Amino acid sequence: MYSLMHRDEPVCAITIDTVSGAIMRVSRPVNPELLPLGGCIDSAALKKWWQHRAVPIGQGKIQRILEQLGITTPQEYLVRNLGLSLTDHYWIKPLDMELGWGDINLFTNDFRDPVGDMQLGQDVNEILELPANAFSPSSSVQGELKKKWIITDGKRCLIKGNHGSNSQESLNEIVATLLHKKQGKQPFVTYNTIRFDNTQPIYCVCESFTSDELELIPAIDIVDSKKKNNAVSYYEHFIAVCVAHGMAEEAVRSFLEYQILTDFILTNTDRHLNNFGVLRNTKTLEFVSMAPIFDSGNSMFWQNPKLPKRDDLTKIDVNSFRRKEMQLLVYVTDKSAVDLSLLPTCDELREIYEKDPLIPCLDSILLGYQKKIELL
């Protein structure tokens, strides 16, 4: 038996299957206001929330790594790490152990990430077991790309890899950082390049924007926390829930419109509802602000570097509030939210991408970038 905890406050008792790591039974919450926002409707939703909290089995080499370590499922690995995350302040407490948030949280306690080491290059066969009583954030890190958490100068930083042999996705994050820095209008995560040796691709690294005071509530949890009227779009529903939690409607709208416009310019096709959200005060549960823009790697035609025709540039599929990129522009009421005169030049982007000579069709990528700007 475990208690689902939010910091040092119990939320509800849960029974977890010792083999699969799945939640089998959920008791009546003792503090229902502390339930995870997206898992507060019923026990089935909480079980689903727990399942989605675990590292995806398709992330990098995670399946092979877990097999090597004798771990059956990602949820079992999550249980071994007490459900801890560097995204929020939820965890599970064994009922027979005296533990507190201060003893185990990853924000103020040092940790190592041996699974992350294996994800980013160390031979999987070199790690035969994980250190006992040492918790790691790798059991709850999300996304398909291989990742590793490190602590540098006391800061929690995430290193992120790429699909395939070139470094375009990591360099896309550098491009997005430059764009947002030059605009200076909305909060964003700063990415830098990192390389372990010349035999490996360029990776990107960023500092965590959560802390022991602030946690991320993903947009998917926000829209799922309240029943949506069928006549209302998910976009408007998200805004309405944020406003109901005390956020200023104008601030939410201006952020979303800026994000839509910059994603359009960068051809970021993967702004799904786990890739943006709200920062919440972990003690008062107040919605403080929109989380800074992060995760723009799936952009700049990275899956199709050969320049599509102009007509094709208006038919790009996306994973977001709408299925087509052009449809998202309908939500934008103020295109001056982005200053086109301050966008990075093609020469600036070329300098970034030329760090990796393996990136194909660079001229076509830059031409596509120019044409997308012209569409605005």
Where are these regions (language model features)?
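Phosphate/dinucleotide-binding and metal-coordinating scaffold of catalytic cores
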Residues: 1-261, 265-267, 278-376
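Canonical protein kinase catalytic loop motif
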Residues: 272-277
